[in-house]
Each structure stands twice: as C-alpha cells, then as structure tokens.
C-alpha cells in the first residue's frame, strides 16, 4: 500500500528475540550479528578446513581495527612461536581469530559480565539474572488508566527514584549482598513492572497510587529497600521457594492460677473404659494371650503387610544369613494423606468433578503408585497381645517418694524396626508451667528399618551424636524446642518407661493427644489420662475420627506447629507437640472453670469445692460426655 520510510530501521526492536512480527519496523541487525560472528570464529578454529595460505592474507586487513595492546600480545606470541611459510600451526589460528572478530561483538552484551560479577560476589548458588533490554516507555495494556504523557511522566519519576535507591546501595561499602545492585536494564524493567502493576490493578486511582508509591520509596531506608528488593528479585528472576520460618510459640496465658488450673484438670479426666475397640489398653494381656501371639508370628514366617504401599514382604529380625533385613526391594508410596475436596450444592449443575488427591504431591488418586521411594518396606503392629509379646504392658506403680506431683504432658516419636513401630524419643513437660522434665532418645529393640524422620524429626546423626543417659538430675528448662542431637540416649523402651514412671503416680493426670498411641509405644496402662483427641471431638461424630493436633493448635491457639514435616527436612518436634497439647487442655480448663464459677464452685487447698445444694448436678455437667455419633446411634436404636 505505502512505501516504507524506514524511520525505525536503525532502532533496536524492544521485543528483541521475542518479537513475533514477520515484517518488523525496528532493527534486528544486532541480534543476528552476534551468532554470525560466533559462527565465523568457530569456523576459523577448525584447522582442517582452512587452507594454509589464508593465514597470511586475512588477518592483516582486520588487524588495523585491533587495539595496540592486543597487537603487542599477538606479536609477542609470534616471536615465541615462529610461523613457517609452508605450514600453519593450529595454535596461531586460535590466537588470531578472537582478536580479529572482537569489533563485531554487539554492544548490548556489555552488561552480561556485570551481572555475572555481581552474582559471583555473593558466594551463593543463585542463578544469574537475565533482564530484557527495554526502553523506558510505558507498556501497552488493554485499557490505559491515563494518557501517554501522564504515564510517561510518572514512569520517569518512578525510574529516577529507583535509580537513587540503587545508587545508595552501590555507594555502601559495608553491603555484603552485591547482587542487590541493579544494572540499568534491571532498573528499567523494575520501573516498568511497578507502573504496569498499578495500571492494571488500580486504574481508577492510578495517579494517586503511583505517587504514594514514589513517596514511600523516596523515604525508604536502605535496609527496607534491600529487604523489598530481595523479594522482587526472587519473584522476578530466581523463583526460589523460601524455607518456612518457624516462629517461637507465644506463651499461653489464662486468668487462672496454677493451683486453680490443676484443680480444674480433675474435671477433664478421660474415662478409658469402653474404648478398647479404639486402641486404648485398660488391662495387662495374660500369658496365654502372649503365647497365642507368638505362635501366630512364628507361623507367619515373617510375612507382613507394608504400612505405606500395602505390599506383602518378609521381615528377618536379627538379619538373614546374607545380612538382609527385609525382602521386596524398595517401597514406593505417598507420604501424604489422601484428601477429598468438600463438595458444593451446585456441583451437579456446573458439572464439577471434585476428585481426591494426595497432599504430598497433589497427584490424583490412582495416577501413580507413589511420589517417594523408601529403602525398605515397613509395617506396624497394632494388636495388643502381639505388642505385649515384644514388651509387656505395665500399670503405673505407686510412688511414695513423689509428693504433690504435677500433671505431665508427654509425647512420643516412633520409628520403624524389624519388630514394627517402636519408641525412639520420649518427651515429658510439666503442666501447666510447660517446663521440660524429660527428653531422651530411645534405642529400639529391633533393627532400624526407617526412623520415619519426616514425622519423628529423629535422624541417624542424632543417634551418632547422642551421649549415654546420666542419672544425675537435670534442671528443668523453659519451654523450648530442643534439637534431638543434644539429647541423651537410653538403652531400651523399658528404661525410658521407668524414667517416666519416676514422675507419675496412678492419680497423676497424664496428658496427650491421641494418647493411646503414646501409651502403647511405652507399654503403659495409666488410669488417669486427659486425651485432647477426645476433649475436642471430631465434628463427624467423635471416635474413631480424630482432629489432628496441628489443626487444633491452629484453631484454638493460633499457633503453627509441625511445620518441619511438610518438607521432610526437620520433622516434628515432640517438645513442641507436648506444649501444644498442654495449652489445649488449659483452654478447655478455662472454659470449664467459667461454668463452675457461675455455679458457685471455689478452689480451697488445691481442690474444687462444690456448693452444698447442687454439688452432684454441677459435677456431672462438667464431666465429658459421649460423642455426638454415639448419641445419635443410641437414640436411633431406642
């Protein structure tokens, strides 16, 4: 239609390699010259394809463009290695060709060495930044919030403010992270990103938002600018996921005194009678039951079902002749639980299919056999008589030497061995103060298959660095999250159980979450327990469904716990879990005491005293009732 004037043919294309136009108005000459120059240099580096006489003819006219310093190096190298007329060594061709092609290198590649140098000074393994070369020109969007002149004026002001902050960092000699100093291209890109973001997100108040942003940047300190710049660079270039920051839990406070909390705890005791079907052990297995369990294990010849992938495999306690502990090879499984998204009433209208997925990898159920591979298969023993065949249960003995014992919160960590899932760490803290009174590593009875470090937080190096347990009394410490590498090691689960018995009497409240698992791991039968899994029943009807400790801590304490288990790098911390369990009981104790106080109850000498007229009535109201599911089942059958 019209003859092109070529007014933009000398201007580099702003889109560079990403330009998709067939006949672009801008120049792409610099983009194509660099690869061509590199190809020519590579071609000259191949001595087999070069005729011997070309070495004399071609370098001379191009040597005029070479700087004097470079010519001096070339001449010196020529004197050290004389060139014969008949042959041309390949080394001389390599020395001359880069010098002759140096003027053809595009100018826009001069910023690359700067970025590499800045990143190298940090000493980190972050990838190099590759900012596109853009003009300081507002980016085109579908609906512009202002005229071009207004956007251009604001963009220049924003760019100038960013340059000023960047110059302050560049002049700071004490700056350790030199990679925070931006190149001119990166400053332009950052200004364009800031302006474009406001133009898209706040078009109606575009001018005010950008001006406030410029004022905030101009008043920002170097420390705040460096922090904000790190977040921007990570999102823009590095895309490195930040490790979860574990915050120190805030101490939980109530309006009750320690004496009042301990007194109210007597109203929160969980009766275990009738809960045997849910894993709670209330009596010691007999010798006949243990013998039956041993015969069953002998007849099975070591064949078990994998706890993770449900595969059948054979386990060899004490090792097989060739040193093998298990058969079946490696185990491929999903460490996370399966999750089904809640359905909506409009799903049948919209046709939405909500399929279940695994929380560890977000894969749909049935897509793969697993996302994690374990060295061996593992299994867990849940039958009471078989647990007793490995280590017999014991009831909490009387302890006449222990006067006025305080309630104890305890938590156990378990790992997989050739005998099933065994105790590997035991932690106990006082309640309600939360002082640590016992925290030891435990050497299991069987050979270790998997320490279950993703959840237990115990790694092999913790056993390597552990010291034998000392009977010397240890000072109670403030609530803290100790590393297992600092713990002492006891010889067996029975030894750990004895240490816990030294802190208890049969009437001492023992507090835990899903306490049946911890009691069974220690082989303890304790008559006075407070289980937060029953204290806070599941909305689905109570047992066998249970709310996780992490969910309860977030809901009632506004506390994030067990954050190390997501990545598998740290795992859970039994001290953290024990403290959270104790604080959940304190929350419930405060609610119960509020109702008791309204009824006229008081605390005298560490005991609850009921009013004379309605002591029995109020006492029954404060005790825990049966779950909602049991109530509905009873009402439906009657």
Swiss-Prot record:
<keyword id="KW-0963">Cytoplasm</keyword>
<dbReference type="InterPro" id="IPR036397">
    <property type="entry name" value="RNaseH_sf"/>
</dbReference>
<comment type="function">
    <text>3' to 5' exoribonuclease required for proper 3' end maturation of MRP RNA and of the U5L snRNA.</text>
</comment>
<dbReference type="GO" id="GO:0005737">
    <property type="term" value="C:cytoplasm"/>
</dbReference>
<dbReference type="GO" id="GO:0004527">
    <property type="term" value="F:exonuclease activity"/>
</dbReference>
<feature type="compositionally biased region" description="Polar residues">
    <location>
        <begin position="612"/>
        <end position="622"/>
    </location>
</feature>
<feature type="region of interest" description="Disordered">
    <location>
        <begin position="612"/>
        <end position="638"/>
    </location>
</feature>
<feature type="region of interest" description="Disordered">
    <location>
        <begin position="37"/>
        <end position="136"/>
    </location>
</feature>
<dbReference type="GO" id="GO:0031125">
    <property type="term" value="P:rRNA 3'-end processing"/>
</dbReference>
<dbReference type="InterPro" id="IPR012337">
    <property type="entry name" value="RNaseH-like_sf"/>
</dbReference>
<feature type="compositionally biased region" description="Polar residues">
    <location>
        <begin position="77"/>
        <end position="111"/>
    </location>
</feature>
<dbReference type="GO" id="GO:0005634">
    <property type="term" value="C:nucleus"/>
</dbReference>
<dbReference type="GO" id="GO:0003676">
    <property type="term" value="F:nucleic acid binding"/>
</dbReference>
<protein>
    <recommendedName>
        <fullName>RNA exonuclease 3</fullName>
        <ecNumber>3.1.-.-</ecNumber>
    </recommendedName>
</protein>
<keyword id="KW-0698">rRNA processing</keyword>
<feature type="compositionally biased region" description="Basic and acidic residues">
    <location>
        <begin position="55"/>
        <end position="76"/>
    </location>
</feature>
<feature type="domain" description="Exonuclease">
    <location>
        <begin position="408"/>
        <end position="584"/>
    </location>
</feature>
<keyword id="KW-0540">Nuclease</keyword>
<keyword id="KW-0378">Hydrolase</keyword>
<dbReference type="InterPro" id="IPR047021">
    <property type="entry name" value="REXO1/3/4-like"/>
</dbReference>
<comment type="similarity">
    <text>Belongs to the REXO1/REXO3 family.</text>
</comment>
<dbReference type="InterPro" id="IPR034922">
    <property type="entry name" value="REX1-like_exo"/>
</dbReference>
<keyword id="KW-0539">Nucleus</keyword>
<keyword id="KW-0269">Exonuclease</keyword>
<dbReference type="InterPro" id="IPR013520">
    <property type="entry name" value="Exonuclease_RNaseT/DNA_pol3"/>
</dbReference>
